[in-house]
Regions:
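Non-heme di-metal
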Residues: 2-265
Length: 265
């Protein structure tokens, strides 16, 4: 009988990501701004992974029939709820609202002088012409373009277990921690960047407490005891890690080029 995909397997992949030099390379607000203007596309395409999985695990079909692991259904539904319509930062009147994590991230970008215009132009083009034309014809950064294409290749496989493998590797707990440490180091307080700090607090809480163990359960639920699916999922996890490492390499190179432009400009 197959034992499934273990936490150790996923952890071994994540270790490569967490040791990437990009996390220690960000030392100025300009570096952070450059990072975020690339990373925002990864924040956006994560929603497509979970929306695809929701359509497979908890489809909106009727007549409805009870079927499958209800804890997995709840996980994917809650993940969509949190990512698409989480509690927003209270406004000046302390009124509560709701916001996607992508929109929160864009607000955080603006607080440190980043410009989300290009990613919004990219989304506008998706509405008009679809994802493939948008990736080919917009001013999306090259590193982000390549990474986003890799995400949609997982989805286009039409295999939920492959998409779940990409999901399991789609979050890196080190990023919110890196952001928080950097903001503290250069003195950007919660008063200076309330949306940024709020975004980080939400992610650390949700990722560490809920998402990681349940994403592995979802992956094993979709693979079952099928060795072929398990091997495909492991291969997809490796591919997801490679895509992310290549992404970080390219973003780090762009950060270094940006530093040179600032010095010579």
């Amino acid at each position: 009988m197959s034992k499934g995909i273990s936490e150790e397997i996923i952890a071994s992949f994540k270790q490569q990501l967490e040791q990437h030099p990009i996390y220690s390379a960000i030392s100025t607000v300009d570096d952070l701004r450059c990072f975020m203007e690339h990373h925002v596309y990864s924040v956006w395409d994560f929603m497509s992974l979970i929306k695809y999985l929701q359509s497979k695990v908890a489809p909106d079909e009727y007549p409805w029939l009870p079927d499958g692991d209800t804890s997995i259904k709840r996980f994917i539904n809650e993940l969509v709820l949190e990512e698409e319509s989480d509690q927003a930062l209270p406004d000046k009147n302390n009124s509560d609202g709701f916001s996607s994590h992508f929109e929160l991230y864009c607000e955080a970008m603006k607080e440190i002088g980043g410009n989300p215009h290009d990613v919004h132009a990219f989304l506008d083009q998706i509405k008009k012409a679809g994802i493939n034309k948008a990736l080919a014809n917009t001013s999306i950064p090259e590193a982000s373009r390549i990474f986003t294409r890799s995400t949609f290749k997982f989805i286009e496989s039409g295999k939920p277990h492959i998409v779940a493998a990409a999901l399991a590797l789609g979050r890196e707990h080190i990023i919110p921690c890196m952001f928080r440490s950097f903001l503290q180091e250069i003195g950007i307080t919660e008063q200076d960047a309330p949306a940024f700090h709020y975004y980080l607090n939400r992610h650390v809480h949700l990722d560490e407490d809920f998402h990681a163990p349940l994403s592995l359960r979802l992956l094993n639920e979709l693979c079952g005891e099928d060795n072929i699916k398990q091997n495909e999922a492991i291969d997809a996890a490796k591919a997801a890690v490679t895509a992310r490492l290549d992404f970080w390499d390219a973003v780090l190179e762009e950060i270094e080029c940006n530093r040179k432009r600032v010095k010579t400009g």
